[in-house]
């Protein structure tokens, strides 16, 4: 295991996840998450929206999930590997001296939310709808809060994670999914059915 992988594991540790390339999608078989009603916005996203208000009031024209193709999956794999390799994992406390700062990793360092923001930005620039690129808060097997990017497709929901270069169906990650951005408004969040109270700070 190289030093970059070790750093990623120290910043956002997830037990049992291998950091290797690949598409974890047997026969493209996956399901979509079942979401509930509106819920609290993570405090880090709330502060991010104050800094980038234009990014938090977008209402995508189409709410249909992306069509799952080999081309889309290659795009997801390429962006995942590129961002994971280009950003050095570092905690908000080490970077900013405080917790829960969501920011683009333009200086080449960041924590799990920052990887998510960058992947979302890059995929959006390639034409993937923001309705299909959803910042998502999960709980890891050890109970710690974590953030990943959910990609909605007509073949199910897939996850891009800074802890692995694989693109996995959401229900094969081992995480408990708690909340994610609403598909119809980038500034709103919805609960995910079956989740529990999030450990990441939220605006109540």
Q: What is each of the regions a protein language model found here?
A:
Residues 2, 26-204:
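A structural boundary/capping signal
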Residues 2-13:
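Bacterial N-terminal signal peptides that target proteins for export
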């Amino acid at each position: 295991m190289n030093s970059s992988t070790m750093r990623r594991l120290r910043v956002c540790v997830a037990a049992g996840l291998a950091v290797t390339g690949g598409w974890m999608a047997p026969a493209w078989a996956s399901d979509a998450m079942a979401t509930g009603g509106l819920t609290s916005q993570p405090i880090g996203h709330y502060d991010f929206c104050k800094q980038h208000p234009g990014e938090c009031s977008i209402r995508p024209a189409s709410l249909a999930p992306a069509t799952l193709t080999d081309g889309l999956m290659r795009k997801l794999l390429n962006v995942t590997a590129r961002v994971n390799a280009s950003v050095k994992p570092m905690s908000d406390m080490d970077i900013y001296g405080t917790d829960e700062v969501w920011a683009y990793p333009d200086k080449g360092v960041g924590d799990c939310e920052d990887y998510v923001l960058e992947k979302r930005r890059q995929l959006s620039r390639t034409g993937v709808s923001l309705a299909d690129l959803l910042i998502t808060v999960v709980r890891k097997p050890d109970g710690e809060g974590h953030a990943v990017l959910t990609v909605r497709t007509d073949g199910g929901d897939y996850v891009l994670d800074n802890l692995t270069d694989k693109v996995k169906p959401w229900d094969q990650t081992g995480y408990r999914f708690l909340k994610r951005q609403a598909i119809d408004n980038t500034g709103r969040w919805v609960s995910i059915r079956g989740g529990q109270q999030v450990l990441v700070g939220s605006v109540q």
